[in-house]
Amino acid sequence: MKQTYIVDGVRTPIGKFKGMLAAVRTDDLAAMTIAKLLEKNPELDPAAIDDVILGCANQAGEDNRNVARMAALLAGLPWSVPGETVNRLCASGMSAAIHAHRAIMVGDGDLFIAGGVENMSRGPYVISKSESAFDTGSKMYDTSFGWRFVNPKMKELYGTHAMGETAENLVEQFGISREDQDAFALWSQQKAARAQERGRFRLEKFAVEILQRKKDPIIFVEDEFMKPNTTLEALGGLRAAFKKDGSVTAGNSSGLNDGAVALLMASGEAVERHGLKPLARVVSSAVAGVEPRIMGIGPVEASKKALAKVDLTLDDMDIIELNEAFAAQVLACTRELGLVDNDERINPNGGAIALGHPLGVTGGRILHSAALELQETGKKYALVSMCIGVGQGYATILERA
């Protein structure tokens, strides 16, 4: 089997809900990110790309009908380069990268663009069609986030808990206090603020030009969801968002966000042929299913599977990127894995509580961030994992190249 390498990557700044990126079409957002990745690698012939694979969780609006293919064409790739869109909800970006990894492993290609896009601000309203003449039972849903068109049998079997409710279920099951959740959220904000101050995120992102009618374009540079000046007191004053007398709040949760990411992934042969300098090698990956009502525990089982495949343990991991859907969810996972809450390996540059969580993007973002961190620190292994709505977890192990 061939080896797979993450060679390069780039992302947009992450936009807040109805923020700076709300004016940008989802397919354009993906296209400009792909174009920037190619611009960063001028030695590559775009026609040599074997496939473009993007994750996207919504796909109800401008991201419909295979946004990866649309974005590839809009980015200027020749029509001979194909494209595929994958959907594993919160882990869509990671799934896209592992799709590329598997294709490289079995010899189906040597050069791939993988990543994801999500513009939750632009998720459309959708309405069901009438089932019969004069039927007044049509329903309308906001597709930005959450369940829609639920199968009654699904609700009967597993319930349709909102994501925040699944976090509250973990709070109850693992006895996680509000104070611990807020402390973790503050830690995420502080780490992200330090990373921003030292220019760490400049290694990941590019400035987005947002066109204005009859005005000069706006240049969007900095992640806008971050709250670097928050305090424990401010976090402690927020009301529970999902359950009366609950402890999961807007402050200790990730947000609804917009963005795009693109990774250049290559086989060892392609690295040599094109003179590329890889960041990290994909060592192992695994996906696992868990009970939907506690979907946030998914990274535990996925991580165990990914580690076992290659006879590694958590002690071998130098960096642990665990997506912060909710502070409660991260703490449930770390405690179940036997880690202390403030293990210095966890999300060294902050996570989604600070930066935001554009669903189709985050998996690709944290893979790239972990690969860069391995290079910057000279460390060997990173474990990158995330929970997934409806009860799954995904994990990938990287080794510094």
Locations of the language-model features?
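Conserved beta-ketoacyl condensing-enzyme motif
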Residues: 22-112, 116-135, 205-221, 293-294, ...
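Active-site nucleophile and cofactor-binding loops and adjacent substrate-binding regions
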Residues: 64, 83-92, 252-256, 282, ...
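Flexible glycine-/small-residue-enriched beta->alpha junction loops
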Residues: 111-169
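N-terminal extracellular/periplasmic Venus flytrap/periplasmic-binding protein-like
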Residues: 11-12, 23-32, 43, 180-273, ...
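Short, well-ordered amphipathic alpha-helical segments that serve as non-catalytic structural scaffolds
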Residues: 27-41, 67-71, 96-99, 163-170, ...
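Active-site pocket-lining segment
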Residues: 165-168, 204, 212-214, 283-354
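Active-site-proximal alpha-helical scaffold in enzymes
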Residues: 86-118, 171-200, 262-269, 335, ...
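Condensing-enzyme catalytic core mediating Claisen C-C bond formation in acyl metabolism
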Residues: 1-26, 145, 150, 231-297, ...
